[in-house]
């Protein structure tokens, strides 16, 4: 497995990966999400590759106060082999190198498997409520 920064040639394969991982939602246009990411800290958009095929991804961010991770996904055929841990670990190292003191991760409330994975990596559930507001309406995907 190789973990590397996303490249433009990965575009379609990453979207297909996200479909396999059930990460896409009708209100998010994955193509726009990738384009936006490529304009802001593209070196924090990582993919895991095995034999030339992309099998995992994570999209990280850092605003100078806290880091974030989105679109963490590993193809179902490659789960349970440490790919997600490796992607998060690499993102953590990149964020630490920038002086980032904390990484916040959003997980759907009913995603027990992913919550358990993060807990094994010493992440803790926070007593906060996340609020959101759509500022730009993407086309439905």
Curated annotation (Swiss-Prot):
Enumerate the UniProt keywords alphabetically: Acyltransferase, Transferase
Q: Where is the N-acetyltransferase domain?
A: 1-141
Is the keyword Transcription regulation assigned to this protein? Answer: no
Instruction: Tell whether Electron transport is among the UniProt keywords.
Output: no
Q: Which SUPFAM superfamilies match?
A: Acyl-CoA N-acyltransferases (Nat)
Q: Which Gene3D superfamilies match?
A: 3.40.630.30
Query: Per the record, a Pfam family?
Result: Acetyltransf_1
Single GO term (MF): acyltransferase activity, transferring groups other than amino-acyl groups
The EC number of this protein is 2.3.1.-
- Which top class of enzyme applies to this chain? transferase
Of which family is this protein a member?
Belongs to the acetyltransferase family. YpeA subfamily.
NCBIfam families, per database record:
PRK03624.1
Q: What is the name of the protein in this document?
A: Acetyltransferase YE1169
In its UniProt entry, the species of origin is given as: Yersinia enterocolitica serotype O:8 / biotype 1B (strain NCTC 13174 / 8081)
């Amino acid at each position: 497995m190789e973990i590397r920064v996303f490249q433009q040639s990965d575009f379609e394969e990453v979207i297909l990966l996200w479909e396999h991982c059930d990460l896409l939602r009708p209100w998010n246009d994955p193509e726009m999400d990738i384009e936006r990411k490529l304009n802001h800290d593209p070196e924090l958009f990582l993919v895991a590759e095995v034999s030339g095929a992309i099998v995992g991804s994570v999209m990280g961010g850092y605003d100078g106060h806290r880091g974030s991770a989105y679109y963490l996904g590993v193809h179902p055929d490659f789960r349970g082999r440490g790919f997600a841990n490796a992607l998060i670990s690499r993102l953590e190292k990149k964020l630490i190198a920038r002086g980032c003191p904390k990484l916040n991760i959003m997980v759907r409330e009913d995603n027990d498997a992913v919550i358990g994975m993060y807990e094994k990596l010493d992440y803790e559930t926070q007593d906060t409520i996340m609020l959101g507001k759509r500022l730009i309406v993407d086309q439905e995907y």
